[in-house]
Amino acid sequence: MIYVECKADKSLVHVIADIRPYEIEHCPGKNEVLKKLLKDKKSIGIIDEDPNASSPPELKKFKSRKSKLSLKFYYEESNNNLLIIICPNLENWIIEASIEGKINLNSYDLPSNPVDFHNIINLNITKFQNLLHGLLKKENERLLTLRECIENYIRNGNCPHLR
């Protein structure tokens, strides 16, 4: 199972990885993602870092393993769970991916301001999904890294970024 904190995260996982929608569960906030993850085995949680917010106490049960492309990878050994933290948050991460891929957000009717971007993708998830497909066509390294980790962990219980 993959636990995420918002519908945009759910769309991200569904679009970039070969994961069925029923294998992705939307939880109301990062605390709930972590609680669900700690009750499950061999699962993945995806949350935003949100550096200005306080860290949930459950985060202490996960060990930091590696960081790559503004993704932080954590591991919880007792239940064999993976936690992926998107830094600083999904909106900024995707905007940066678009800049790196030389994708004009205006061509997807999306703003480059993270707050406005957040509001728009939550009102019209299709625009966000179209952007994700555009990033994948350009073989964006951020999305490919996240995809590789999710798919490998679900299939083999192994993420190359935990080593």
Please annotate each region the language model reported.
Residues 15-19, 36-44, 51-163:
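C-terminal accessory helical subdomains adjacent to catalytic cores in phosphodiester-
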Residues 1-44:
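RecA-like P-loop NTPase motor core
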